[in-house]
């Protein structure tokens, strides 16, 4: 509404939607109302904030300018409805009045958890402050939000902080509109707030600050500790001693997966390289793990067993407790406390039970974690930071898409690295990271996360439920169950199409495009395993127009775990029985196993067809002796990339393409020849990456020329690979194409639920 005032005084009602709860928005409104001599009130309506003001027209105009331009740093205004109403001089002052529950289906937005602010950090380190060394210090501008809230409106009684009644001094701050802790729901102090304690697994051995000091001592001595934080639990140990890190790997069952570490800016400069974008992410209030390039001095400070890649995942402290851990150590391993494939533990009893035998000691506290939330992870690829995992610090804040939609859509995601998503109007509410839903405990976590996001977005009615095409996914079965419960239609989206739609929605780009959808596995429209797809998006429809050569996945899922099987399968196609003689050099298969594998290949028994990019890269990794057994998702190809990075020369490549199909048998055969000719592994690894990148780009270019399309994009788990993605990007830009890539949602399966929502809307009219 354009405010054209007639008369000296007037009354205006303002409805503010967006991130306006738990971010100091009402105190801010109070202050600018008082500053501008206005009367009225501000009220939290559960899913929006209502403001009623009366006063002089110029004062109201100034108030609205302040509202738009001086809002709190954590807030976000998505919509501002302003209407003039009749009557004046109803109020004698300006008030913050009691919140109301949401009365309609309009969604509210719960802010994400944010790192401790500079003001709170300063107070916590001030010996004269009453919150000196108090690990749960928080205010309006920082601290837990999503992880403590049970329902809207975001008031203390609706959070786990209701277990801690405010003391007199905290209550005074909480009620003072001019105080930084006015209506800050996480407000507390050592007298009235949560308490930290240290356990040896049997009994409490230290409490309060003594527990923290003893934890630091135990870490320095080389012990492994479970540390309960804001959204879950970490396992921590020192980074510099091989035996300590190896012991954690042994106990946790993670033999090679790189560990993330927690450090501080002055220390990180010693062992890692980072640019301005990466530095800003590390220091941001959202505090994700940022994947950084190791520096030349890395080995001076870190055990080689922390990360066997050329990168290291680093996060900075994001709670008061984290800061208090740093004394002598420059960094700690800080990895999620979960067994492979299972959710991170969060409740004290569960922590003590499930981490028994893994952690030596347990630093716990008595504040309930309502919503589990893993650390977010970002990585710089193609000149931008992209999400490997979008969780703490970001979820459940919505992603806005410029798309017309009047339905409530529930999207249940894929199977691995999963999230779910609620779509309401133009807002896509992704859940926190869920994980591998083929595991029962994680499947239950998915169900709980869906119920929670429905509650927090005030969603009672679902019009459509979207799932993957794969009939055996647990998420597909859940979709069928929920479809019946809500009386909602069910809509299925092919996995790689969902990746492509995710890319389109992420970029608010809905014109024609060629999209490379590349990953390890996805159920194809033909019933085969896809993963190296060239997709045409034209006139609002998605179509597969090219792909990698079909290969046999020897032993089905066993070929994903043991990449030598994939190598043997492709080499057998290239050189016949000689492949079996060659594979013996790795001393991996027994003679009996080789006879069985030969029989399987000859008869095509349990040899599903795949076009997966991941499986081809896995085969190269095995060929070069880099990885023979996958112990975490994507390991063989992830470990191949740093080897390829070490090659600095140029390679002339002419990928073999026929009928828009990239010949990957040729890729493996050429790599095999190079190995026999004693070419170095770095060159062969680099060759494989460039062959795939250039080959797929050539197919995309040919199709774009045929249809007159000027946009090329890349998505899927393989698009985290810097060599492949940046090669395709540079090729596209050099040839004058518009290149699109992810920026707001994960490239991988964490973005599938988002893409499912976009797919449904576009299929039903845009």
Swiss-Prot record:
GO terms for biological process: protein maturation. A zinc finger (C4-type) spans 117-142, 167-192. It comes from the Archaea. GO terms for molecular function: carboxyl- or carbamoyltransferase activity; double-stranded RNA binding; ligase activity; zinc ion binding. InterPro entries: Acylphosphatase-like_dom (IPR001792), Acylphosphatase-like_dom_sf (IPR036046), Acylphosphatase_CS (IPR017968), ATPase_NBD (IPR043129), Carbamoyltrans_HypF-like (IPR051060), Carbamoyltransferase_HypF (IPR004421), DHBP_synth_RibB-like_a/b_dom (IPR017945), HypF_C (IPR041440). Belongs to the carbamoyltransferase HypF family. Involved in the maturation of [NiFe] hydrogenases. Along with HypE, it catalyzes the synthesis of the CN ligands of the active site iron of [NiFe]-hydrogenases. HypF functions as a carbamoyl transferase using carbamoylphosphate as a substrate and transferring the carboxamido moiety in an ATP-dependent reaction to the thiolate of the C-terminal cysteine of HypE yielding a protein-S-carboxamide. This is Probable carbamoyltransferase HypF. It comes from Methanocaldococcus jannaschii (strain ATCC 43067 / DSM 2661 / JAL-1 / JCM 10045 / NBRC 100440) (Methanococcus jannaschii). The gene is hypF.
């Amino acid at each position: 509404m354009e405010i054209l005032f007639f008369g000296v005084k007037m009354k205006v009602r303002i409805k503010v939607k967006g991130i306006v709860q738990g971010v100091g928005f009402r105190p801010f409104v109070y202050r600018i109302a008082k500053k501008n001599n206005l009367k009225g009130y501000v009220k939290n309506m559960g899913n929006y904030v209502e403001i009623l003001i009366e006063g002089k027209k110029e004062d109201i105009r100034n108030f609205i300018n302040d509202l738009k331009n001086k809002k709190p740093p954590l807030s976000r205004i998505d919509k501002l409805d302003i209407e003039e109403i009749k009557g004046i001089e109803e109020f004698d002052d300006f008030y913050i009045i009691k919140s109301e529950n949401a009365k309609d289906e309009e969604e509210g937005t719960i802010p994400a958890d944010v790192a401790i602010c500079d003001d709170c950090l300063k107070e916590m380190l001030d010996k004269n402050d009453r919150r000196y060394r108090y690990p749960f210090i928080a205010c309006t501008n920082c601290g837990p939000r999503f992880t403590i809230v049970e329902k809207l409106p975001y008031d203390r009684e609706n959070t786990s902080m209701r277990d801690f009644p405010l003391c007199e001094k905290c209550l005074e701050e909480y009620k003072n509109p001019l105080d930084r802790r006015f209506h800050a729901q996480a407000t507390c102090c050592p007298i009235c707030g949560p308490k930290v304690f240290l356990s040896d697994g049997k009994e409490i051995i230290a409490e309060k600050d003594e527990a923290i000091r003893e934890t630091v001592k135990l870490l320095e001595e080389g012990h492994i500790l479970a540390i309960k934080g804001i959204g879950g639990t970490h396992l921590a140990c020192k980074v510099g001693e091989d035996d300590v890190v190896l012991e954690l790997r042994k106990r946790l069952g993670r033999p090679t997966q790189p560990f993330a570490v927690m450090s501080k800016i002055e220390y990180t400069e010693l062992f890692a390289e980072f640019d301005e974008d990466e530095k800003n992410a590390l220091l941001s209030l959202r505090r994700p793990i940022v994947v950084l390039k190791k520096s030349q001095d890395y080995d001076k400070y870190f055990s080689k067993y922390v990360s066997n890649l050329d990168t290291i995942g680093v996060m900075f402290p994001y709670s008061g407790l984290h800061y208090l851990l740093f004394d002598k150590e420059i960094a700690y391993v800080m990895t999620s406390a979960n067994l492979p494939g299972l959710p991170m533990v969060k409740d004290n009893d569960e922590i003590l039970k499930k981490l028994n035998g893994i952690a030596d000691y347990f630093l716990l506290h008595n504040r309930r974690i309502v919503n589990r939330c893993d650390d977010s992870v970002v990585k710089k690829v193609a000149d931008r930071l992209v999400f490997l995992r979008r969780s703490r610090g970001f979820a459940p804040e919505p992603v806005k898409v410029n798309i017309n939609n009047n339905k409530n859509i529930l999207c249940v995601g894929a199977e691995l690295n999963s999230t779910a998503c609620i779509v309401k109007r133009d807002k896509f509410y992704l859940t926190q990271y869920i994980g591998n839903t083929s595991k029962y405990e994680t499947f239950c976590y998915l169900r709980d996360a869906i119920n929670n996001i429905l509650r927090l977005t005030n969603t009672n009615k679902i019009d459509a439920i979207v799932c993957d095409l794969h009939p055996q996914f647990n998420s597909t079965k859940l979709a069928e169950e929920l479809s019946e419960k809500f009386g909602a239609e069910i809509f299925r989206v092919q996995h790689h199409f969902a990746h492509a739609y995710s890319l389109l929605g992420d970029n608010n780009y809905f014109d024609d495009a060629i999209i490379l959808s590349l990953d390890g596995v996805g159920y194809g429209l033909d019933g085969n395993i896809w993963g190296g797809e060239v997709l045409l998006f034209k006139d609002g429809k998605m179509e597969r127009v090219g792909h990698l050569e079909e290969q046999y996945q020897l032993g089905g899922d066993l070929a994903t775990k043991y990449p030598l099987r994939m190598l043997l399968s492709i080499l057998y196609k290239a050189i016949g029985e000689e492949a079996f003689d060659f594979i013996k050099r790795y001393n991996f298969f027994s003679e009996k196993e080789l006879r069985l594998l030969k029989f399987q290949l000859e008869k095509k028994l349990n040899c599903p067809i795949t076009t997966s990019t991941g499986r081809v890269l896995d085969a190269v990794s095995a060929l070069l002796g880099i990885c023979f057994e996958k112990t975490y998702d994507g390991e063989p190809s992830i470990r191949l990339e740093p080897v390829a990075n070490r090659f600095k020369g140029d390679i002339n490549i002419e990928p073999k393409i026929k009928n828009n199909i990239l010949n990957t048998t040729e890729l493996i055969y050429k790599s095999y020849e190079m190995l026999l000719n004693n070419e170095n592994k770095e060159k062969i690894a680099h060759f494989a990456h460039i062959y795939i990148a250039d080959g797929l780009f050539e197919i995309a270019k040919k199709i774009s020329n045929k249809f007159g399309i000027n946009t090329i994009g890349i998505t899927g788990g393989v698009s985290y690979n810097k060599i492949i993605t940046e090669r395709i990007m540079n090729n596209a830009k050099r040839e004058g194409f518009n290149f699109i890539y992810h920026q707001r949602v994960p490239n991988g399966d964490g973005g599938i639920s988002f893409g499912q929502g976009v797919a449904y809307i576009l299929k039903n009219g845009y």
